[in-house]
């Protein structure tokens, strides 16, 4: 069985990679961009939609503000990118926001940021994969109703790809990510060329008239209009998700790590901002519209409740290239695919952050080490399990999942900005020349502006989305935070109990050692255990057997006499046939009789040749060992006997057994 599992593992994941080959797994910028930017770039596929959907609540005229909302979002993106460029240079170890906040604001605030990021990474996978699954069912209507199994299957696929290693994942995802960027770039260029030539057609949705919702009849005027603009702005800020992943993945970059990570950040920010603003500008000039509540839609004065609005990119591709054209199909297909690949950013960020938290004793140790392929395999699988659970619980509904999104990342953004402000304040207290001080002041100004912007977005998101599902995210962050505190407390307690404070006392040997061998009969495994115990020369040795009736007692006594062993036999009665409790009681009584002495218990255990044979045996040795391990002052020794190892070879006795005389 084990060989079959190992073979399957090698087929799916690949052969192990030596630790010294880690340098060859590091990412150049051309691979780092698709790995870490797919999340942020894919947000261009739905951030403009969210802006238009929100503004549409105030009617068609309100959509003219969409470009300006996009510009403000791009400004926030620029400030965040500039801030994170400073972070990757100041803290290049891969801790990202967690390290920044822990160092400058304290461990509790750092743990809060880490909890928010972990939750956000899981949500990123759930939202992106669910969106991709729903997009696939739109292209292939026959798959409708199967969104959950499709989404879970896609998560499993991404898990296997990432388990093969970071570099292989980058190679696998580079082509579709670049194809997406090229497709959007071609659409934008052709769109602007047609705009300047005066032959850019209007979108089909431009013919409709969207009436304002009852709560926004005054349009964008008054406090209601300001609040709606803030909602549109906060919805568009989904475009910022994924920016923080690069700061967590600096160790995966080729040298110089910080410089390459900073350049990748600039590339990401520039591409994402230009794509989003260009799409909103083209949407404005084509008259493109989107609305969630179709009861607000009218055509020539008559209601159109059954109208369907395609996503913004699909509408633009249809308008610019023509509905059903090859370029329309290409843009639509790669956009759907990039939504799936967006989850890959989390598959790189989550395991790296989990490894750092594990190093600091906030998460289980299993998340710290790299796997066979030099990826953090346990972290990858933990992320896959968490995301799959959310997909199943929320039925792969993007509408329900999106309400949970963004909160975690903006908690991280805001506290990271505050941490960097504290970082620059510390630098300003050190002696510096004029140019260095001016540079620090400029850097601090960037973070102050970033703190104000991200804090504002966080407040708006919490106010506008709390009752719609953001409360679940807040609860999850609090739960993860509490669990990590409990894990740290456990590890601190264990460290305190294991720490040697008096070396003289711990060097001392036990005064005397007593031993007993637990047997059910005097078989070959039992005789080996007895021989092992005798070889250790304890001051006292006895054979202990539990008997439940007179027949068993006669049988073991007969074997003992026939063996001629110079070791006393002790029979313990068990009229109720409960072997485990009887053995535990007997061992405890021996310990109480001689508490200053060490008691060694030997248990023979035979090992079967095939995994399925274990089902046929009662595994008494394992049950006894688990119980005896918890008795203070008792040392347990398992003496194994592999079935078939004493078979004669070429008519001669095997010489591999040290217990057999030659």
Question: Where do the protein language model's features map onto the residues?
Answer:
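Cytosolic C-terminal regulatory domains/tails of membrane transporters and channels
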Residues: 1-21, 492-662
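Membrane-interface "cap" regions at the ends of multi-pass membrane proteins
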Residues: 1-53, 62, 82, 93, ...
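Loop-to-transmembrane helix boundary motifs in multi-pass membrane proteins
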Residues: 28, 107-110, 145-152, 252-274, ...
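Extracellular loop-to-transmembrane helix junctions
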Residues: 52-103, 107-114, 127-154, 271, ...
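TM-loop-TM module centered on a large, flexible mid-protein loop between adjacent transmembrane helices
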Residues: 106, 267-270, 274-341, 367-392
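Helix-loop-helix junctions that connect adjacent transmembrane segments
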Residues: 178, 185-241, 299, 464, ...
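Hydrophobic alpha-helical segments and their helix-loop junctions in multi-pass secondary transporters
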Residues: 181-213, 280-288, 414-431, 486-495
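C-terminal membrane-solvent junction of multi-pass transporters and transport-like membrane proteins
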Residues: 366-377, 413-466, 504-506
